[in-house]
Amino acid sequence: MEVNILAFIATALFILVPTAFLLIIYVKTVGQSDSFE
């Protein structure tokens, strides 16, 4: 069913986009370790 495929793609993007965004922030935060310690 095409609807299921579209729903799967929408869900994947909905999960991957925020995850990638948080991952970038995490990497930048770890890179600047002097910010916390």
From Swiss-Prot:
Family membership: Belongs to the PsbM family.
Subunit structure, as described in the record: PSII is composed of 1 copy each of membrane proteins PsbA, PsbB, PsbC, PsbD, PsbE, PsbF, PsbH, PsbI, PsbJ, PsbK, PsbL, PsbM, PsbT, PsbX, PsbY, PsbZ, Psb30/Ycf12, at least 3 peripheral proteins of the oxygen-evolving complex and a large number of cofactors. It forms dimeric complexes.
GO BP: photosynthesis, light reaction
Organism for this UniProt entry: Pelargonium hortorum (Common geranium)
Record GO cellular component, one term: photosystem II
Membrane topology summary: Single-pass membrane protein
This protein's record includes keyword Membrane: yes
Sorted UniProt keywords: Chloroplast, Membrane, Photosynthesis, Photosystem II, Plastid, Reaction center, Thylakoid, Transmembrane, Transmembrane helix
Xref: InterPro entries: PSII_PsbM (IPR007826), PSII_PsbM_sf (IPR037269)
Record keyword Transmembrane present: yes
Name listed for the protein in its UniProt record: Photosystem II reaction center protein M
Described function: One of the components of the core complex of photosystem II (PSII). PSII is a light-driven water:plastoquinone oxidoreductase that uses light energy to abstract electrons from H(2)O, generating O(2) and a proton gradient subsequently used for ATP formation. It consists of a core antenna complex that captures photons, and an electron transfer chain that converts photonic excitation into a charge separation. This subunit is found at the monomer-monomer interface.
Gene: psbM
Location in or out of the cell: Plastid, Chloroplast thylakoid membrane
Sequence intervals crossing the membrane: 5-25
